[in-house]
């Protein structure tokens, strides 16, 4: 017991002295802290809300203490440009926690360096080049067509039963991504298991966040048996699922896919087993989430704003007509549909708080010091709703993108759904194509009305790394095209 007390005292004193040293430097201002836990106790379930509120008080660059870890949060487009372009090299490492980060052996959570560059180049060549996107066009169209047919068959059996759109969006997104990555679609049961694992991982309990960021709690984490058990349980489920996927792949696939290329490199000793599984997990989780989340928000906004929905449908009727389904080739001819998607990405970025960067050396941002080792967050949602950048920023107005051509793939720092700089999402163009095709097909094939009064649609966000609607969108569907197109 005496040894435990001495150890605890030593850890607390060390943490206190470390905080004192850091606070003495010219770091950004921020809210008052509590000893040992910093600002963790003040954070709302939606961290972006807390960061946005503090930015209103302390300015667009703030310091937030996540236990003993300093986090610098930027909430303006000018400061985002400094972090993601001007000081990108010094700030492009990853802050990794004990959970869900693959030990940095994958792409998303690896530090910037030779491994990251190699993995990114591999993913780009195999999956995200314009040639690859075009090569898999018919597959995307086939999966979206299957989604349309499923919706039609379901509502035909009971046209007064609301459609829970998320069920179909999750399935089509996962099917497209899984066919790209592993050359097959999941069985329904496996797909549900996959989505369950991902959802629970992105919404871990509060105590786990405390353990992630508080050094002295990490060292005494044996006290938190239930939380540790949860993390171990999720790690086992994740590893079991990845192993099951890899076993399927090792069994042989006739169709060329991403993981086959990885295995060829593995046989040449250029990749480890851990890296192969990490990359597969990255591609499956990131690709499926972004598509389903964005389309659900876009549909919710349009059902709340029927004039926008009707304008998109008029455009679709003019370009596609009523004798066939929408194809990828139609996308360039549908500017207003593209504007709707951009506006949905602006108001509801799939990752409202950019995944954490880490300073590899001390740098100046916005006139303040960002110390080496500090975590750096870009508050994507706050920037996208900044009245300095957008008129009526909280309103759904797709036409704003007709007036001004705006890039959403990392070049315009006012809207950053895919990040920017060395860490920009390599799948941005593929994601945009998938989302535009799926969203356009839903609007072209069906008329949509709310199953409740429009003003009662719950637009609350669900806490987590990614931004799902808290209450899944439900709507009534009716067909707009000749019946033979749905068969």
From Swiss-Prot:
PROSITE patterns: CYTOCHROME_P450 (PS00086). InterPro entries: Cyt_P450, Cyt_P450_CS, Cyt_P450_E_grp-I, Cyt_P450_sf. It is an enzyme of class 1 (oxidoreductase). It is a single-pass membrane protein. It is found in: Membrane. GO terms for biological process: spermidine metabolic process. CDD domains: CYP98. GO terms for cellular component: membrane. It comes from the Eukaryota. This is Cytochrome P450 98A9. The lineage of its organism: Eukaryota, Viridiplantae, Streptophyta, Embryophyta, Tracheophyta.
């Amino acid at each position: 017991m005496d040894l435990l007390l001495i150890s605890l005292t030593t850890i607390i004193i060390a943490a206190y002295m470390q905080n004192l040293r850091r606070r003495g430097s010219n770091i950004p201002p921020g809210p008052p802290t509590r000893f040992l836990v910093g600002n963790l106790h003040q954070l709302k379930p939606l961290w972006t809300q807390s960061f946005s509120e503090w930015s209103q008080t302390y300015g667009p660059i703030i310091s937030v203490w996540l236990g003993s870890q300093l986090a610098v949060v930027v909430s303006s487009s000018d400061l985002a440009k400094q972090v993601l372009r001007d000081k990108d090299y010094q700030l492009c490492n990853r802050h990794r926690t004990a959970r869900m980060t693959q030990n940095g052996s994958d792409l998303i959570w690896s530090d910037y360096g030779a491994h990251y560059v190699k993995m990114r180049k591999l993913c780009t060549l195999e999956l995200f080049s314009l040639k690859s996107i075009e090569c898999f066009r018919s597959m995307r169209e086939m999966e979206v067509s299957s989604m349309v047919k499923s919706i039609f068959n379901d509502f035909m059996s009971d046209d007064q039963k609301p459609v829970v759109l998320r069920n179909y969006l999750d399935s089509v997104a996962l099917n497209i991504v899984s066919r790209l990555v592993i050359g097959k679609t999941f069985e329904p049961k496996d797909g549900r298991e996959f989505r369950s694992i991902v959802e629970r991982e992105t919404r871990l309990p509060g105590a786990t966040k405390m353990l992630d960021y508080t050094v002295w709690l990490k060292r005494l984490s044996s006290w938190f048996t239930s939380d540790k058990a949860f993390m171990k349980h999720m790690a086992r489920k994740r590893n079991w699922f990845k192993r099951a996927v890899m076993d399927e792949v090792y069994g042989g696939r006739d169709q060329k896919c991403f993981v086959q290329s990885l295995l060829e490199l593995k046989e040449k000793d250029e990749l480890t087993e851990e890296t192969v599984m990490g990359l597969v997990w990255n591609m499956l989780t990131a690709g499926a989430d972004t598509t389903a989340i964005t389309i659900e928000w876009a549909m919710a906004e349009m059902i709340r704003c029927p004039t926008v929905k009707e304008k998109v449908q008029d455009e679709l009727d003019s370009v596609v007509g009523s004798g066939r389904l929408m194809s990828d080739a139609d996308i360039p001819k549908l500017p207003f549909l593209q504007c709707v998607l951009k506006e949905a990405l602006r108001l509801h970025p799939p990752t409202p708080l950019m995944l954490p960067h880490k300073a590899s050396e001390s740098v100046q941002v916005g006139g303040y010091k960002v110390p080496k080792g500090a975590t750096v967050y870009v508050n994507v949602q706050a920037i996208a709703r900044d009245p300095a950048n957008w008129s009526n920023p909280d309103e759904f107005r797709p036409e704003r993108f007709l007036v001004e051509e705006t890039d959403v793939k990392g070049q315009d720092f006012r809207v950053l759904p895919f990040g920017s700089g060395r860490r920009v999402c390599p799948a941005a163009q593929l994601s945009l194509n998938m989302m535009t095709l799926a969203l356009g097909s839903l609007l072209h094939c069906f008329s949509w009305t709310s199953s409740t009064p429009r003003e009662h649609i719950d637009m609350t966000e669900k806490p987590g790394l990614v931004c799902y609607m808290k209450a899944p969108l439900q709507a009534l569907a009716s067909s707009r095209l000749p019946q033979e197109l749905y068969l």
